[in-house]
């Protein structure tokens, strides 16, 4: 995700070109999340020409200096005022600090407490790791490159910078997709076996392998070029800017549109089932507790997905618009638009821990324990128990043995035996309604079909809350 989005002016030592130079803007590498400058930069840097447009990484116009000006006399002057740099630095610094710390705490809460080790939470660990890595290894480095248009971090990190962000975003969004599919299966067809810990790890490993394959071209074609006075990091595509544009569109489809479509469908079906399928007349505490817990988890994950979609949408729109309408790249505020859209995209890495803390009592208890050293944070005994106690409910089959004999069978006398000794009677036990689970219902038979999504054998409430 190396970029070159800084507003800068090519100025020759004597000032002849400066008056006619064009600001190089954020859009020169709007692929901050997917790659940076390539063929166009080589054209810009290796050939002399009048102040004219050459295609950049995304097919955007960049300014070439006049032929009379030697490269040695060209300087890269950053034109943003210091107060604006300070504000952007503070904004990006907050994202990095909150994202790294918050996601590391989420990982600790899940892995350090046995009660939290559920299928959904294993995917949340993968999501937290992806977000923390993105914030730690990409956000600040990319921001520095965007501000100064100079690569300070070497050729190897240039490859990593162009390669890893796509990998991390892919892992994040498909971890959310895996959670959506798992919630769908658990609620719509609860009698099917759930993913085991081993199967969950295989799914997570497969997500990362696919992410590496998608991002590999960015690593393969990454290059650095040392120019007089500065170094650039870019992706040089063999077939030029059009190939990069095609690749970026493919990335948008695979890491944004397609997974959001899948999650939209699954959560819509799950939402209709949970909020529209309550059984009339059911007063069982177990039923209502599981229903409430499932609703909370689904609501939390819907908010997580919507946050991701909203944060990344302006960035993708920015790239598409600046690629199609190239004159936008000469707008004097385009760098600020880029920095704002990139900040919003990167800020998606810091919201999830906040959402978990606000909407899930066990994560909230975990965050309290993590910050118990703060004088204004009080950890109650209830918070301690939240991360230690596991509550299991019996399944429908086991609950039938807890009711009385009178409730579980009906004795029927055979009239053909009336002439025999009165003490000799044949008893036939009529099986009880298998939908009965100890809850009082007005019509258990009519409710049995609807209740299948609520209870599965030996289900822990921890799976849903």
Swiss-Prot record:
Keyword Membrane appears in the UniProt entry: yes
Post-translational modification: The anchoring of this receptor to the plasma membrane is probably mediated by the palmitoylation of a cysteine residue.
Chain spans, region Disordered: 415-465
Cysteine pairings via disulfide bonds: 158-233
Signal peptide: none
GO CC terms of this entry: dendrite membrane; neuronal cell body membrane; plasma membrane; sperm midpiece
Membrane-topology descriptor: Multi-pass membrane protein
Lipid attachment site numbers (S-palmitoyl cysteine): 374
Transmembrane segments: 85-107, 118-139, 160-181, 202-222, 246-270, 300-321, 335-359
A Pfam family of this chain: 7tm_1
Composition-biased stretches (Low complexity): 445-465
InterPro entries given in the database record: GPCR_Rhodpsn (IPR000276), GPCR_Rhodpsn_7TM (IPR017452), Neurokn_rcpt (IPR001681), NK3_rcpt (IPR001013)
Keywords: Cell membrane, Disease variant, Disulfide bond, G-protein coupled receptor, Glycoprotein, Hypogonadotropic hypogonadism, Lipoprotein, Membrane, Palmitate, Receptor, Transducer, Transmembrane, Transmembrane helix
Entry's family note: Belongs to the G-protein coupled receptor 1 family.
Name the UniProt record assigns to this protein: Neuromedin-K receptor
UniProt organism field: Homo sapiens
């Amino acid at each position: 995700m190396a970029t070159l989005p800084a507003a800068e002016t090519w100025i020759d030592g004597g000032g002849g070109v400066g008056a006619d130079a064009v600001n190089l803007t954020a859009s020169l590498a709007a692929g901050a999340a997917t790659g940076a400058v390539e063929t166009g930069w080589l054209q810009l840097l290796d050939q002399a020409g009048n102040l004219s447009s050459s295609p950049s990484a995304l097919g955007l116009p960049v300014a070439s200096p006049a032929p009379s000006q030697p490269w040695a006399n060209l300087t890269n002057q950053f034109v943003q005022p210091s107060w604006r740099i300070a504000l952007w630095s503070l904004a990006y610094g907050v994202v990095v600090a909150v994202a790294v710390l918050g996601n590391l705490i989420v990982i600790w809460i899940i892995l350090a407490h046995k009660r939290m080790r559920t299928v959904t939470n294993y995917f949340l660990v993968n999501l937290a790791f992806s977000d923390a890595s993105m914030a730690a290894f990409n956000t600040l480095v990319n921001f520095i490159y965007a501000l100064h248009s100079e690569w300070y971090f070497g050729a190897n990190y240039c490859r990593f910078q162009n390669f890893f962000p796509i990998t991390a975003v892919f892992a994040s969004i498909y971890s959310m997709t895996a959670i959506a599919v798992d919630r769908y299966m658990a609620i719509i067809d609860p009698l099917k076996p759930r993913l085991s810990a081993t199967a969950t790890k295989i799914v997570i490993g497969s997500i990362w392998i696919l992410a590496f394959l998608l991002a590999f071209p960015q690593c393969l074609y990454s290059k650095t070029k040392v120019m007089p006075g500065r170094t650039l990091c870019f992706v040089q595509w063999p077939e030029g800017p059009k190939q990069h544009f095609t690749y970026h569109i493919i990335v948008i489809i695979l890491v944004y549109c397609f997974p959001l479509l899948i999650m939209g469908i699954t959560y819509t079906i799950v939402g209709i089932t949970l909020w529209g399928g309550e059984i009339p007349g059911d007063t069982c505490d177990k039923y209502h507790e599981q229903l409430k817990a499932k609703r909370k988890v689904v609501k939390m994950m819907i908010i997580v997905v919507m946050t991701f979609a909203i944060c990344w949408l302006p960035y993708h729109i920015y790239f598409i618009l600046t690629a199609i309408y190239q004159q936008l790249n000469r707008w004097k505020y385009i760098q600020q638009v880029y920095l704002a859209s990139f900040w919003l995209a990167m800020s998606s890495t810091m919201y999830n821990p906040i959402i978990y803390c606000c909407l899930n009592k066990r994560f909230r208890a975990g965050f309290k324990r993590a910050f118990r050293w703060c004088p204004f944070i009080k950890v109650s005994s209830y918070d301690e128990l939240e991360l230690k106690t596991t509550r299991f409910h019996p399944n429908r089959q086991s609950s039938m043995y807890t009711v009385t004999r009178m409730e579980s069978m009906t004795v029927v006398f055979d009239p053909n035996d009336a002439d025999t000794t009165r003490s000799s009677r044949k008893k036939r036990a009529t099986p009880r309604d298998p939908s009965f689970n100890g809850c009082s219902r007005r019509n258990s038979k009519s409710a049995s079909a609807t209740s299948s999504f609520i209870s599965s054998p030996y289900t822990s409430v921890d799976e849903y809350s």
